Amino acid sequence: QAHGMGQLIDLVPNHMGVLGADNAWWNDVLEKGQASAYAEYFDIDWHSATPGLAGKVLLPVLGAPYGEVLARGELSVEYEARSNRWFARYFEHRLPLAPASIFGPLRDAAAGGKPEVLAQALDGINGPAGHDALHALLDAQSWRLAHWRCAADEINYRRFFHVNQLPALRTQREEVFRATHA
């Protein structure tokens, strides 16, 4: 107040919150991987030596190891007709799926415009008999789901301390700096 200020705000412009499905840049990276216009905005190690992480972003959001979560049926696929987009769902996490990864029966069911056919196709992949197909679909993404405890050892992006939902931005790059300060 001695300096005529009513409020002082401490900004952290080199990190960005990505929790939830509201961050368009992060979701674009998840959907398109290295082909995303924003892939270089985040400080992601796309060439990780960790098995299964080359070309992928680690998403340590699971409450248990991946195999257990899959076996318990806690992962599912959703289709959003109004945007013609596909998502993987894990409780509150809604993760975009790469359009090219959507295989024949699901793609055809959505294109057919018959809700009952689409519901049947989704029941097939989301049910116990669809675990192999669901795993193959998830494995084809530019991200890899993992138990949250894996983050300390396997995370392949710089973040704010150990907060997985605050990945670092490469604000040292002029285009990123401008985009984050617009």
Q: Could you say what each language-model-derived stretch is?
A:
Residues 1-182:
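Catalytic cores of glycan-processing enzymes that make or break glycosidic bonds
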